[in-house]
């Protein structure tokens, strides 16, 4: 039996959910059109008579590849299953894949390529908050759509991102409330690595511990 860490499991299921949501999003958008694509020049468009182009942007190389490879595999599996079921209103989903290379500026660069040069309908991608924050200005400038496939620290909202995972208050605060109620905990030790998710999550947790639970 193969075992997955909680983050990897959430990432895989979140990626799968994101791809399935995209199917609904694109099909709804397509049904809203009052004209067939045959009536327009579809060269370079995200949706043509035969295909719907989407981008997949994860780290396939570098230190983050060990986590992100599973996400892109789940997304490609979901798209394969959608295509085998007839696609989106008879259109096959065409994948354009890019490698973020575990480098945050590269995520921004590849996001711009997918939106500006490849004209994808949406991008499934990023993993760390650093990669998402690097790519976010590009999606907002180009009015693109990013499906972010895993949980994150919160404190960020954008009309150009669908956050498919929980944010920190939906995870950590529930756990703290349980420990306080069931175990009577008063003193807490917050331990995490030095990057965006732990730093922000610990700030949220500390405020909840002190202001709501009366602990320290």
Where would I find each of the regions flagged by the language model?
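Glycine- and acidic-residue-enriched helix-capping/strand-helix junction motifs
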Residues: 63-73, 196-201
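An alpha-beta-alpha
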Residues: 60, 161-216
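Short beta-strand segments enriched in small/hydrophobic residues
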Residues: 50-68, 126, 187-191
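Loop/turn elements at helix/coil->beta-strand transitions in domains of secreted/extracellular proteins
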Residues: 50-53, 90-93, 118-122, 141-145, ...
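N-terminal secretory signal peptides and thylakoid transit peptides that target proteins
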Residues: 1-20
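Beta-alpha junction/loop-to-helix N-cap segments that form part of ligand/metal-binding clefts
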Residues: 35, 39-42, 66-73, 86-155
């Amino acid at each position: 039996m193969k075992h997955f860490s909680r983050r990897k499991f959430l990432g895989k299921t979140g990626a799968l959910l994101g791809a399935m949501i995209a199917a609904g999003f694109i099909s709804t958008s397509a049904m809203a059109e009052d004209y067939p694509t045959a009536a327009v020049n579809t060269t370079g468009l995200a949706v043509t008579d035969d295909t719907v182009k989407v981008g997949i942007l994860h780290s396939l190389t570098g230190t983050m590849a060990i986590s992100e490879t599973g996400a892109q595999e789940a997304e490609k599996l979901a798209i394969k299953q959608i295509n085998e079921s007839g696609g989106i209103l008879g259109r096959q989903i065409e994948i354009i894949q890019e490698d973020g290379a575990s480098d945050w500026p590269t995520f921004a660069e590849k996001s711009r390529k997918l939106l500006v040069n490849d004209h994808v309908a949406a991008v499934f991608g990023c993993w760390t908050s650093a990669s998402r924050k690097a790519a976010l200005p590009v999606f907002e400038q180009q009015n693109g759509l990013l499906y972010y496939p895993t949980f994150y620290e919160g404190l960020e909202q954008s009309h150009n991102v669908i956050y498919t995972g929980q944010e920190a208050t939906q995870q950590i605060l529930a756990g703290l409330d349980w420990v306080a109620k069931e175990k009577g905990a008063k003193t807490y030790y917050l331990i995490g690595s030095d990057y965006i998710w732990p730093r922000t999550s610990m700030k949220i947790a500390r405020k909840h511990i002190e202001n709501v639970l009366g602990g320290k």
